[in-house]
């Protein structure tokens, strides 16, 4: 098992060297929500799809990448054109991401959103978002992405314990929080900032 790898960016080699202050974060989220509202005013989603909740999650995806680095000499790191985000089993979220990131970049790259319907379609994305799925399908996904520099993220209770690297959950006061599976990160080839770990709930500790 690999040791946990840390990064600590400075202002010269990454967009942000520290987590945003509370006022800055609130302003950032308000602006994103306003933009999303304008973009999505004519969009149609399933009745049970919470646009506000998933807009916040879309913002989190980009924020996570500010504190994660992909290893050198990999297709993810050296891809000159796009930052690839694959979404498994949630077409509404895929469409929302396309609307939000059609003019925005992640790690200085244009964002390409891919819909995935089964594990065999996974093609080394930078980030893979996994919606609620069966244990069998999740096991197949994690087997395919194990020991690869693909950041796995979900929003289903128990998925972090099962091997997903980052999982969203709702706190008791209905705030979006996230947990990180430390062992899953250790087994990946990703470099993660201690600053991200410090604000997450940690699961899978040795």
Located regions from the model:
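Hydrophobic h-region of N-terminal signal peptides that target proteins for export
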Residues: 36-44
């Amino acid at each position: 098992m690999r040791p946990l790898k840390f990064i600590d960016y400075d202002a010269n080699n990454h967009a942000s060297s520290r987590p945003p202050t509370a006022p800055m974060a609130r302003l950032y989220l308000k602006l994103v929500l306003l933009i999303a509202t304008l973009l999505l005013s004519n969009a149609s989603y399933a009745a049970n799809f919470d646009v506000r909740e998933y807009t916040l999650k879309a913002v989190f995806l980009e924020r996570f990448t500010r504190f994660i680095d992909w290893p050198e000499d990999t297709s993810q790191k050296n891809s000159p054109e796009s930052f690839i985000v694959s979404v498994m089993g949630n077409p509404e979220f895929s469409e929302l991401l396309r609307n939000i990131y059609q003019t925005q970049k992640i790690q200085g790259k244009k964002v390409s959103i891919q819909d995935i319907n089964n594990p065999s379609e996974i093609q080394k994305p930078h980030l893979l978002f996994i919606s609620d799925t069966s244990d069998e399908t999740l096991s197949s996904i994690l087997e395919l992405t194990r020991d690869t520099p693909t950041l796995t993220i979900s929003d289903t209770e128990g998925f972090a314990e099962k091997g997903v690297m980052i999982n969203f959950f709702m706190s008791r006061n209905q705030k979006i929080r996230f947990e990180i599976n430390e062992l899953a990160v250790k087994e990946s080839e990703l470099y993660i900032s201690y600053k991200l770990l410090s604000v997450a709930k940690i699961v899978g500790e040795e």
